[in-house]
Design a protein with these regions (language model features):
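Active-site and substrate-binding clefts of carbohydrate-active enzymes
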Residues: 1-46, 181-191, 195-198, 210-213, ...
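Short, solvent-exposed loop/turn segments at secondary-structure junctions
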Residues: 11-13, 74-78, 107-110, 147-150, ...
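Short, well-structured secondary-structure segments
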Residues: 3-8, 14-17, 21-116, 140-143, ...
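Alpha-helical scaffolding within the catalytic cores
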Residues: 53-54, 82-95, 174-186, 221-227
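Short "domain-exit" segments at the C-terminal end of structured domains
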Residues: 314-318
Length: 318
């Protein structure tokens, strides 16, 4: 049976206020509390709360067959606790269904995996503790900032005890291979990998409300027919995207919530199930290993970390 693995990323940075020359030595508080509060309230109303209600309804109306995974950065969770505790409560309600998996990542949605192994491990442990405190579970699956992955990173993640990791299905890495299979790390064979299906993910994240798209409007029936038409041997369709796709990037007026609500029914009609990453790692075996000597990510056309590495290495220009 073909299965869909939905994963949503959630991150909100602590935004910094304008800091003037004459503030140096006089003002030691750097955060823009007004902007932080305004933005997370707006995103909560547009996305987090209505999307969580939609996911909960989908789980209930499907008889528990709809499943999903979230990765919520620690700093985003901190802001929710401060400004929108009702969002935390709604995620706890989802957690109580047993149909939602919370993944681990770096606490600050940082690039520490690219340059500071000790800081990376520290942030991952801090994130584990945050998820355990809020939702009562210890994450078993890892997802790095912007899906950043390399052989070296996979070795660290495996060393920390994770059984699986999510990353980008980059074409220059896969070549002729399909992202719709499970793979493993070539340097840490016990670490299984789920790779993002770019086409199907971006049909939702980028193209859903694009009037110029030749497939507009996209219906749940049409979308599921595309997935059902993939080769029978390709058992996993990994749909990875930002949670703000629901309600913020695509406003409610586009029909995005109604589209999602219809997915379980049309999936069932075509014999397609939904699984969490942990379930997939338990049920399906890797077909091959992949080698990624240089970091990849889901950012930009190149699907690499070139822009991130520029930010790390480039000196500050005055």
């Amino acid at each position: 049976m073909k299965t869909i693995c939905f994963y949503f990323q959630i991150h909100q940075p602590f935004r910094l206020k304008r800091y003037r020359f004459f503030d140096i030595g006089n003002d030691h508080y750097y955060y823009d509390d007004f902007q932080n509060e305004e933005i997370i309230h707006r995103i909560a109303e547009q996305c987090y709360l209505p999307a969580n209600r939609t996911i909960l309804e989908m789980i209930k109306t499907s008889g528990g067959k709809f499943k999903v995974a979230f990765s919520i950065s620690g700093v985003a969770l901190e802001q929710m606790e401060i400004y929108t505790p009702e969002v935390i409560d709604s995620f706890k309600e989802l957690a109580a269904t047993g149909n939602v998996e919370f993944l681990s990542e770096t606490y600050a949605h940082s690039l520490s995996s690219l340059g500071d192994p000790e800081e990376f491990k520290h942030q991952v442990k801090k994130q584990e503790d945050k998820i355990k405190t809020l939702f009562g579970v210890k994450p078993k699956v890892f997802r790095n900032t912007e899906l950043i992955y390399s052989d070296d990173i996979s070795a660290m993640v495996s060393e920390m005890g994770y059984k699986g990791m999510l990353t980008e299905g980059a074409k220059h890495i896969l070549g002729w291979k399909s992202p719709n299979y499970m793979y493993s790390s070539c340097v840490a064979p016990k670490l299984s990998l789920l790779l993002k299906n770019d086409r199907f993910s971006e049909d939702l994240s980028n193209r859903f409300s694009d009037y110029s798209w030749n497939e507009y409007p996209l219906t749940a029936d049409k979308y599921m027919s595309w997935i059902a038409a993939t080769p029978d041997s390709e058992q996993i369709i990994n749909l990875f995207m930002n949670y703000e796709v629901l309600g913020s990037l695509h406003p409610a007026s586009t029909g995005i919530f109604e589209f999602f609500k219809a997915l379980p029914r049309f999936a069932a009609d075509k014999g397609i199930s939904f699984s969490t990453p942990s379930e997939v790692f338990t049920l399906i075996k890797p077909v091959d290993s992949i080698s990624v000597p240089y970091p990849i990510s889901w950012v930009d056309e190149e699907r690499d970390c070139s822009l991130s590495l520029i930010h790390i290495s480039e000196p500050t220009r005055l």
